[in-house]
Amino acid sequence: SAVAMHIKGTPKDMQKDPQYDDLMAEIISYFENVAWKANVAGIKQIIIDPGIGFGKTVEHNLQIIKNLSDLKRLDTPIMIGISRKSMIGKILNTDDVNDRHEGTITLNTISVLNGAHIIRVHDVIEGVRTAKIIDAYRKA
């Protein structure tokens, strides 16, 4: 298995006015191409990460989270990395990463409910507790 992450541009220029004609369609097309290349290379399963914060505006990131279920058609696990991201700081108007816990938990919860299978976190205990609550909710 391998994790493949979407990025628009390169780390040097990715945040310089990122533009998309159709955000989700471009991300899906990217992963279809990656899956084909991975298969040719003998990698049978990839985990996809839409790359929150990598060549995307806050609005793009929120659109991805809102439409995460669109990626289910790729029939592969979806990983999301939102933990402490600057987008949370921008939404909450704070530069302090210690003020991003609630935003991380909220967006992780929404992401899992919208189709994410894996959440990448800095705060493992809070992440596990969030997952347990989501599991209990789904089983109710």
Identify the role of each PLM range.
Residues 1-40, 55-140:
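Active-site-adjacent loop and "lid" segments of alpha/beta metabolic enzymes
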Residues 52:
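Active-site metal-binding loops of divalent metal-dependent hydrolases
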